[in-house]
Amino acid sequence: MAAKLHFFVTSLAFFTLAVMTSGHWNNNQPNQCQTSVPSCFPIKPYIRVTLQAKSILQTPTFNYVAVVTLRKQNLLGFLEKAVDTNYGFRFSSSYFGSALGYMVDKINGTAASTQNQTFWQISSNGTALNCGVSTYYPRNNEVILFNFTTYANAGHV
């Protein structure tokens, strides 16, 4: 029970951080985040998710694609599996405690920077997600893009 409560608090807090730091909360956009504890039963189905990491702002540039099949879970789990199964894919994240959760800050050596006003924007079908890797649960056959961009390019200034 304590683990479920911890997961709930982490998910809710990270959702709040994602909304506060995104700077583009859109009340017309449906809530994309899972803020409640998912049921353990029935067993979740396997889903296939394509992860794309794209960086063209600085060298080395890259456009990396990993296709991952796992039981339905949060986006962080799919990133971890991509590292396990695809030797060319690496990421790091910072954990901000149970109140805030995880935030991806580096993919394949390219790091987000508040000084340079760059970050890894997460989107699906051209729509920026309003939550992060701890609370977003991809759908089957979804393509998730991690695009290295600037605050200005993403409309956050």
Annotate each PLM feature.
Residues 2-157:
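Ubiquitin-like/PB1-type beta-grasp interaction modules and other compact soluble beta-rich domains
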